[in-house]
Amino acid sequence: MISSSVSRAASLIGRLACLLAPLILSSPLAWAENWNISGQAKYFLSHSRYDADNVFAAAASRSPIDHHLNLRLSANQRWGNRWDTVIHYTASALSADSIEAARSFSALPTLAGYGSPNDDARLFNLTSVVSDQGKNLQAHRFDRLSVGYSETGYVFRFGRHAVSWGNGMIFQPMDIFNPFSPTTIDKEYKPGDDMAYLQNLLASGNDLQSVLIPRRDIASGDLRADESSLAMKYHHYTGGGADMDFLAARHYGENLAGFGFAIDWQGAVIRGDLVNVWTAAGTTVSGVTSINYSWVWDGHNMSGYGEYFRNGYGISDGNYNALALTANAALMNRISRREIFTLGKDYVAGGITIEVTPRWLLNAALINNMNDNSWLAQWVANFDWQENWTVLAGTNLPFGAKGTEYGGIEGATSGEYIGGGKSMFLQIAHYF
C-alpha cells in the first residue's frame, strides 16, 4: 500500500516538475527585477598525520594536505503575495592528497565519504563534474532550486530543497535526509534533495510537515518506490516548555516511526529521539538523548551538553574487520547514503562552548565509542574576523588502540589500518 502510494506520488511529482520548471526558469521570473542576490566564498585547508601502517600513508603520504575552495551564489525572490523562488548555485574545486589516496582503495569511498558528487539517484540532474582525476576534483551544481507557495495555514515547496528534523545535539537518528556528520564543523547548508514539501500550520501552534523525495535506481535511471522516501512529522507543543515530534515514513522500502521531545527542566533542556525501523530482518531501534545548559562564568557566556547515542545498526563487539563490515549490510548501506557516520552501537559525547569575546567562540567536543573505548576530541575556534569575514580553525585528535574506530580500523590487508589520523584545519569565509 505504502509502496504503491510512493510510486504514484513519484509519477505525479515528475509531471509536476514538467509544469513548474518553465515557471521557475521562464524569462518573466528568472530575469525579473528585485532579486535578493548574495553569496559566499570559502577556503578550507586541512593537514592530517597518519601512522606508517595507515592505508593513506601507503597510497600517498603520511601527512596529506587538502585544499577546498567553494563558491555559493544565492538568488531569492518573492513574486506576488504568495509565490517565491530560491536558487543556489555552487562551484567547488579540490586539490587533496586524501582523494588521491582514496582512489587506490575500494573500501575507502564508503567508509570515508569520498566520491564525485552526482545526482544519479535524484529526480533532476543538476550536477556537473568538470574534472575528477588524481588529487583534483572540480564540480558545480544547483544545491537549491525550488518554487514555493505560502498561504495562511500552509506552505508548499517543490524542487531542490533541504529539511532538518531531530533533536540531537551531534547525533541525529531522526534526521533521515542528509544529516550532518557529528564532526562536521561547517553546518551552514545541508545538501539539497529534490522534493515536494508541505507544511500545515495549525491554529494551535502545532504543525504537520510532509515530504516526498522520489529517487532513481542508479543502474537503470528509473524512479523506484523502494529507493524513494515519503515522510510525515507532526510537531506538538504541549505548553509549559515541552515539545513533541511524531514521525512516520516509508524510507528506502522500509517502514519507519519515530518520537522526539524537548523539555525545559531546571534551566536546562532535555532532548531525545527514538526511531524504530521495520526491516526484512526484524526491527531496529536507534535513539539519542541529551541535556544542555547555558550559564555565565566570569562575564563569559557558556553552554555545555552531554549526549548518549544508540546506533541500532552498529557493531557492539568492536570487531570492524572487512568481513564483519561486509556482513552488516544495513549499516554499510546507511553509511554509503550518508545517514550514519559511526560503526559502533553505543556512544557518549560532551561539549562546551565559551564566548571568549562577542566575536570569538571556542568549542570543544569529546566523543567516546563505548564498545571499543576509543575517543575523538575536537577543538574549534570561531572568529568573526571583520564584517563579512569569518575564520574557523581547529583540530581533530583521535585516541584508541589499533583496530578501534577512532584508533584506526583494520584494512583489507593485514597490518594496514584505515582512519585514526590526527588533523588540523582552517576555514576562511567571505560573505557578499
What feature does the model see in each segment?
Residues 32-59, 67, 87, 206:
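Transmembrane beta-strand segments of Gram-negative outer membrane beta-barrel proteins
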Residues 76-207, 213, 400:
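Outer membrane beta-barrel
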Residues 35, 81-85, 153-156, 205-208, ...:
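Repeated loop/turn-to-beta-strand initiation elements of outer-membrane beta-barrel proteins
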Residues 63-69, 138-143, 150-152, 190-194, ...:
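Residues that define the transmembrane beta-barrel architecture of outer-membrane proteins
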Residues 268-367:
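Detector for outer-membrane/organellar transmembrane beta-barrel domains
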Residues 43-49, 91-95, 151-153, 160-164, ...:
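Transmembrane beta-strands of outer-membrane beta-barrel pores
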Residues 383, 388-390, 395, 415-432:
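Outer-membrane beta-barrel "beta-signal"
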Residues 33-35, 75-79, 148-151, 200-202, ...:
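Residue-level signature of outer-membrane beta-barrel architecture
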